[in-house]
Amino acid sequence: MKRILFLLIALAVAAFGGWYYWQFSQRISSATVAGLLPRETIFVAQIPDFNRARDEWEHCDIYQLYREPAVQDFLRKPLGNVPKTDAVSQTLLDIEQLAPKNAFVALTSIENNNPKFVGGFHFQGKQEEAERIIGKWRSVLMGQNSSLKREKVQYQGHEIEAAKTASFTIATAYDPPWFFVATDAADMQALLDRADRRSSDSNNRLDKDEAYRSAVSRRPSNDVASFYLQPKAFSQRLAALRAAVGSTPAPGEGTMIEKMRCITGSMRFENGKIHDVLFLGMPKLEQNTTLTRSSLSLGTKETFFYLAMLLNLGERMDTLNQAAAFAGTKIFQTLSDSGITAADWKAAFGIELGSLANWPSDSHWPSLLVTVPVTDATKAQQIVEALLKAEEDGSWTATEKNGVRYFSKQSAASFVAITPTIALSDRILIAGLDPASVEESMKRSRGNSSELADSQTYKAAAHLLPAPTNFFAYLDMVQLYSRLDASLRPMLLMAAAFVPAVAGSIDPTKLPAPEVITKHLSPIVSSQRYDGDGYMAESIGPITLDQLGIGAAIFSSFGAAAARHRGLAVPATAFPQAPHPSPTP
């Protein structure tokens, strides 16, 4: 009987111990990333679930395009020139095995220009299994550096392993199922305290900060990556710098960063598309003004790019004049010399800027248009004439047709022949690269319908995002790629025939057919609005507008560097750059 009683007691103790350990481990594993960080954290980036993000990436449109057999066949030659390494593939396999969740890296402070970082992730499996992979990474990172001083410290039941040199420290520790890394041993101890719920100050956590809570409430629950930035540290440094030089801004004035309470961004996959969201917590800058997209009436079925945004140039004439002077031009100084003030500009023009790019199928290059509403035709004409006088050669010619004033100028010979033209009516100013497109656009501005607005492609794309209040952009990737292929494919074939460097890099005969590419493409749309207490900027497409802009900049820099290395000329192009949405100053 005693043996049975003893056995029951032992089982009860074991069950209680197992339950307690399970509860403790669940409490640790359920700790949010924000709950692990100090309240004054400046920046944190997070990937909630690496394997889920990778799986969704492999099902998105742009990855499916990359996996097309024809695309792989075309890329085989250029990729063959790149040194092969298995390190990246092995690292991805290791990460997949760890199955990291809530992976994060955070900038917690900048003291004496010494940034401090912490990071970590929730791993799958046992600590010993994780250490086999992480230990390998640690060895590669540390290498055979003889100046490294390694030490192990016991702290609250955890082993902190630190590697130190005279200039930096890297501390790592396990708190299963978490692995943590920090650039300061004291920060590592604080991180472990928060993970184990031992922190004496429960309010000193990022998730207790009101600005952070407001920002992350705008973040979708199904994102694959996100970040949060607290600009206060930078605005305080700017204020200190102003005080040091004796500069005091007037009440209500200040830089954009001083007006921002917080910034957060996220990315998710949505029906094969990439969807970015950016939130800027700050006061509204535009008063009683909203985007009308009135320039949409100029669009045609051949329009592949459309932009509308609020841009109050009248408020920024002094800044623009300083920038122009720095660039070596006196375009805005001419307005001042002519007695034209910022008030005159605001009276002459509306604040909604529009831009369109059309590419007819029978044209080798696109035509670009820029539009501004006219509210006072007389003042607008005075401003235009004053600006044109800034041209030193004075080669602009003026004509009038059907009540519209046209100003045009023949540019010097270049890779793409252009004739800058400005049309001014009592309702709108249109600037373009050739007289024909400007005149046709002026005719369309008098109508009430738009081929672009009526197209199903545009309608479907525009409805993917909430209605904008101060920024909207649309880019038809199918039409753009089709036109680029028709114009550049013959040039690429010719270049490969006469330029050995091109022939050695790619095989243009294996360039995929346009339909192989375009079946994976769809329009890119970007929309920005003021929502409650900040600006919400969203973009969706096979890639987003910001990603397109960053990619184009990287590609251009690499292309220019390669051309300089090989002694090739890099012709200028007339393609529009991807704009970045920002609040209207």
Which residues make up each language-model segment?
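Long, C-terminal catalytic modules of enzymes
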Residues: 231-236, 245, 413-415, 435-436, ...
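Structural boundary/hinge residues at secondary-structure and domain interfaces
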Residues: 2-162, 207-264, 269-364, 381-394, ...
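Flexible, glycine/threonine-enriched loop-and-boundary segments that flank and lead into catalytic domains
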Residues: 400-417
